[in-house]
């Protein structure tokens, strides 16, 4: 009765789970109440409108003739069925007084990447989940959490930590957008995903598309280990230059050249660096320049 659906952005998870699944459930059991929560109330109302319009369609009536909308309750974010069930949309942090349900859906608990990086926003969302949303799911009810990962301490991260400590057991459906096997190649083929990866950067790509968030400090290196130094006062050290060379110009792989300093077990210096998609004559000049400096 606990499901996580972790997918990359724009891969249809909301369409299936937040817009079509509630309509299906109410077609099967029109006495049920559904609570749908999203990062903003506007997004929740959008999902509610889609579910409502689906139930109003002739195609739906052909499949589920006994489930109809109550004539006196058809607002996009709050409506009932003719059998007493209904749908209520709320933003994360919103009030649920007097509202509850047998099915609770949380779809995209963070509005932006920046929100997910904020400890304050994450804490408020968690307090709302544990203190408001969770308590409105009736005994025997189900919870579905839909999102793409944004932080190792996001809602899914905390729920999985809670599970490890003996909390609710979650069925996790994870769909990483690997380049070798794109989950929706008709929309996002390998070339499209590679462009997204290049623009997003490693940390966003790992979280949003691979569902594998990494700490802001990194997995292997902590920010607190690094300090700035005055380039005019370089400590005594051994200097060496390394390079990863390519031969294409304005395309293909990058050439990276870096000069480092080593002054013992606790002193490693990044002294100089350059990268570019250039031919050999160009990066040779940059390498010589670093030697000279």
Language-model features and meaning:
Residues 234-262:
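Gly/Thr-rich phosphate-binding beta-strand-loop-beta motif of the actin/hexokinase/Hsp70
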Residues 117-182:
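ASCE P-loop NTPase helicase motor core
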Residues 76-132:
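Conserved RecA-like ASCE ATPase "motif II neighborhood" in helicase/translocase motors
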Residues 258-293:
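Nucleic-acid-processing active sites and adjacent nucleic-acid-binding tracks
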């Amino acid at each position: 009765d606990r499901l996580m659906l972790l997918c990359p952005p724009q891969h249809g998870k909301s369409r299936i789970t937040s817009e079509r699944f509630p309509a299906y459930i109410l077609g099967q059991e029109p006495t049920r109440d559904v609570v749908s929560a999203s990062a903003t109330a506007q997004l929740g109302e959008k999902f509610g409108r889609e579910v409502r319009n689906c139930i109003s369609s002739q195609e739906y009536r052909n499949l589920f003739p006994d489930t109809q909308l109550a004539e006196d309750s058809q607002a996009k974010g709050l409506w009932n069925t003719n059998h007493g069930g209904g749908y209520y949309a709320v933003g994360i942090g919103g009030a649920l007084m007097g509202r509850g349900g047998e099915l609770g859906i949380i779809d995209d608990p963070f509005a932006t990447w920046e929100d997910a990086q904020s400890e304050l926003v994450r804490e408020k969302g968690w307090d709302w989940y544990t203190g408001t949303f969770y308590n409105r799911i009736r005994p025997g009810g189900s919870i579905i959490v839909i999102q793409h990962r944004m932080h190792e301490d996001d809602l899914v991260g905390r729920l999985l930590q809670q599970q490890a400590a003996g909390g609710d057991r979650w069925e996790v459906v994870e769909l990483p957008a690997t380049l070798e096997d794109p989950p929706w190649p008709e929309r996002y083929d390998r070339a499209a995903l590679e462009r997204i990866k290049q623009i997003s950067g490693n940390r966003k790509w790992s979280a949003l598309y691979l569902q594998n968030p990494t700490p802001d400090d990194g997995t292997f290196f902590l920010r607190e280990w690094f300090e700035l130094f005055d380039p005019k006062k370089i400590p005594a050290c051994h200097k060496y230059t390394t390079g990863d060379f390519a031969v294409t110009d304005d395309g293909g792989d990058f050439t990276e050249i870096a000069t480092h300093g080593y002054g013992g077990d606790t002193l490693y210096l990044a002294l100089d660096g350059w990268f570019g998609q250039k031919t050999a004559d160009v990066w040779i000049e940059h390498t010589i320049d670093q030697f000279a400096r």
